[in-house]
A protein has these predicted regions:
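Glycan-processing catalytic domains of CAZymes
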Residues: 1-213
């Protein structure tokens, strides 16, 4: 009678004896890591399948810092701001953690940003507004009085949201913020494919690669 199979158990670097005990008690046929660390030799020698976590878009800050133009981005829309007399200043980062995001004013903002008159529903011409980098604000020079306006802009993700969540919830101290890179970008795409091939060659004991953020 076969009493082994169809059970995968998680492990961690500080739970090796418990993992070995549960592997035997439950008849598990696979072990997966929880934190992406290397498997200790004791677990490699069990004969169980090894499921290894692989981070496709982070945990390589050296690359991320060397290629800041290929950091992941997202679009953010500001709240509605009402114009009165004179110019209207719309701050972009209100309510947004500067540890998490940074305004992308590197790319062509006239092409990629959008300022909308929400009262009329019309997008403003790029000549009707400008960006003040010192205050991280968009200034509409001659808005219609009492009309509401929003700005949609690109922001770099300078701290991976999953890593940020884990750091805050687990109260991690003195942990470097992991910067997510965009694997769709040309330099990072080529680097990521090379990095994955090198990982597979250097981890022959891994049966299944678990892609994660």
């Amino acid at each position: 009678m076969n009493t082994k199979g169809r059970v995968t158990i998680p492990t961690d670097m500080d739970a090796v004896p418990e993992t070995l005990a549960l592997l035997k008690r439950w008849g598990a046929d696979a072990i997966r890591d929880c934190d992406g660390t290397e498997f200790p030799q004791e677990l490699k020698d069990t004969g169980a399948k090894i499921y290894a976590t692989y981070y496709t878009t982070r945990k390589d800050n050296a690359w991320a810092k060397a290629n800041p133009d290929e950091t992941q981005q997202c679009y953010i829309m500001t709240p509605f701001y009402t114009a009165e007399d004179g110019a209207l200043t719309i701050p972009l980062m209100t309510g947004i953690s500067r540890e998490l995001m940074k305004v992308n004013d590197h790319d062509d903002i006239a092409r990629w940003w959008e300022v909308i008159d929400r009262t009329t529903g019309e997008a403003l011409d790029a000549a009707a507004w400008h960006y003040d980098a010192a205050t991280e604000s968009v200034v509409i020079d001659a808005p219609a009085a009492y009309h509401e306006y929003t700005v949609s802009f690109l922001a770099y993700l300078i701290w991976d949201p999953v890593h940020m969540y884990n750091s805050v919830i687990n109260d991690w101290k003195d942990v470097e913020h992991q910067i997510p890179f965009d694997v769709r970008q040309p330099k990072t795409h080529a680097y990521t494919m090379r990095r994955l091939r090198e990982y597979l060659e250097s981890h022959p004991y891994v049966n299944v690669v678990r892609f994660t953020t």
